[in-house]
């Protein structure tokens, strides 16, 4: 749906995002299934544009992934050597986008399935509620690849599971399945395979979240 949308929302749909309104819920779909919805620079920019320019009628948002995975993290085909200034700029672009998700004016629910890995876990951790179906698995492979967790996840993820568990994930490549992810705090809900999006879209949940979200949005940024 592009009619009557902000121009930046329309542009986002050319960069790997599909956007639509379902009642008062903004549904944001990561649409790079061939890449397992890996986060390219264009997709990160599109997430920023979407969450900075949601329609006024949006009272909640849901993020989900097209295909077999939520998000497999950084698009490694774009990985390249950067000098210090370029590295800071790239990291800040992720911070701005994920801050727009976490600190925007509506509560955001992530509907998780398949890979929630690296930058995908950073994105999920910026959401307020995470619903994971039974196919979900979590990992932080950055440490084994010599990549820094640079989008604010180094603060957000330890707040969910503790610094020791995050360190273990990064240093050993440990992978958590859906059940263990819920147990340690990576998700609040664990549902049968294929049902995460329906669970996330429940109107009662969106309404209940919205009533307290403005208090959450005034909290200091965790990024």
Language-model regions: role of each:
Residues 1-66, 85, 99, 203:
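Conserved CoA-thioester-binding segment of acyl-CoA-metabolizing enzymes
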Residues 8-11, 100-208:
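Crotonase-fold acyl-CoA enzyme core
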Residues 28, 63, 75, 123-125, ...:
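Hydrophobic/aromatic residues within transmembrane alpha-helices
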Residues 57, 65-100, 116, 146:
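Glycine- (often His-adjacent) and acidic-residue-rich active-site loop
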């Amino acid at each position: 749906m592009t009619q009557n949308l902000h121009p930046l929302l329309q542009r986002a749909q050319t960069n790997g995002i599909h956007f639509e309104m379902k009642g008062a819920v903004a549904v944001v779909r990561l649409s790079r299934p061939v890449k397992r919805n890996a986060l390219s620079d264009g997709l990160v920019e599109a997430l920023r544009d979407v969450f900075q320019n949601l329609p006024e009628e949006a009272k909640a948002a849901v993020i989900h992934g097209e295909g077999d995975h939520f998000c497999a993290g950084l698009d490694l085909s774009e990985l390249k050597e950067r000098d210090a200034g370029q590295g800071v700029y790239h990291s800040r672009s992720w911070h701005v986008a994920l801050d727009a998700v976490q600190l925007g004016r509506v509560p955001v629910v992530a509907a998780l399935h398949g890979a929630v890995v690296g930058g995908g876990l950073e994105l999920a951790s910026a959401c307020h509620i995470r619903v994971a179906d039974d196919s979900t698995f979590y990992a932080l492979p950055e440490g084994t690849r010599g990549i820094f967790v640079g989008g604010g996840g180094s603060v957000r993820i330890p707040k969910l599971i503790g610094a020791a568990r995050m360190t273990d994930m990064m240093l050993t490549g440990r992978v958590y399945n859906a059940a263990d992810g819920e147990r340690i705090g990576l998700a609040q809900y664990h549902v049968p395979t294929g049902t995460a999006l329906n669970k996330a879209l429940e109107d009662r949940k969106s309404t209940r979240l919205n009533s307290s979200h403005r208090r959450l949005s005034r909290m200091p940024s965790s990024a």
